Amino acid sequence: MTAIQLIVGLGNPGAEYEQTRHNAGAFFVERIAAAQRVNLVPERKFFGLTGRFTHQGQDVRLLIPTTYMNRSGQAVAALAGFYRIPIESILVAHDELDLPPGVAKLKVGGGHGGHNGLRDIIAQLGNQNTFHRLRLGIGHPGDASKVSGFVLGRAPRAEQEKLDASIDFALGVLPDIFAGEWNRAMKNLHSQKA
């Protein structure tokens, strides 16, 4: 299995979106950066905040696009192209309506499931979807017409605590992910629920 060289955390830029459900992926990358003592700095040519650390001699780059969600692919394609990172070496962390808060799941490939950030990444990578995903459950409002307001809203405290716990679970399986032990990472992560 190809080693992960790029971890992307999806979200929207700006203070008004900072603590919204849609920024769950960005929360995950911020937590990795803090744990690795990496400063995320703006890089205009990559349309995002970037950082780098080394894990067992392998560079791992972090990216939080500063484009709006529906233009996330611009940042991912720019950074992956510049550093020649294979699509299979990318892990994208994002909010997931189809999972309840407190649940996180890993997935390889697949469609966008209506997620505009994933849709744009797939398009910008030449309609290739073989990157890895970390799906962070945020729950569903129950009615499709309420999705936009829901993802752009802040979670109540109890819900946010569950999301934070699922991010902790995901951070706990990063060593397996870096080792290419995807089955073990999935088994361990998928058995956790806040």
Curated annotation (Swiss-Prot):
It comes from the Bacteria. The keyword tRNA-binding applies. Keywords: Cytoplasm, Hydrolase, RNA-binding, tRNA-binding. SUPFAM superfamilies: Peptidyl-tRNA hydrolase-like. Its EC number is 3.1.1.29. GO terms for cellular component: cytoplasm. It is an enzyme of class 3 (hydrolase). It is found in: Cytoplasm. Pfam families: Pept_tRNA_hydro. The record marks D95 as: Stabilizes the basic form of H active site to accept a proton. Signal peptide: none annotated. The active site is at H22. It catalyses: an N-acyl-L-alpha-aminoacyl-tRNA + H2O = an N-acyl-L-amino acid + a tRNA + H(+). GO terms for biological process: protein quality control for misfolded or incompletely synthesized proteins; rescue of stalled ribosome. One of its GO terms (molecular function) is peptidyl-tRNA hydrolase activity. The record marks N12 as: Discriminates between blocked and unblocked aminoacyl-tRNA. PANTHER family: PEPTIDYL-TRNA HYDROLASE. HAMAP family: Pept_tRNA_hydro_bact. Monomer. Hydrolyzes ribosome-free peptidyl-tRNAs (with 1 or more amino acids incorporated), which drop off the ribosome during protein synthesis, or as a result of ribosome stalling. Belongs to the PTH family. This is Peptidyl-tRNA hydrolase.
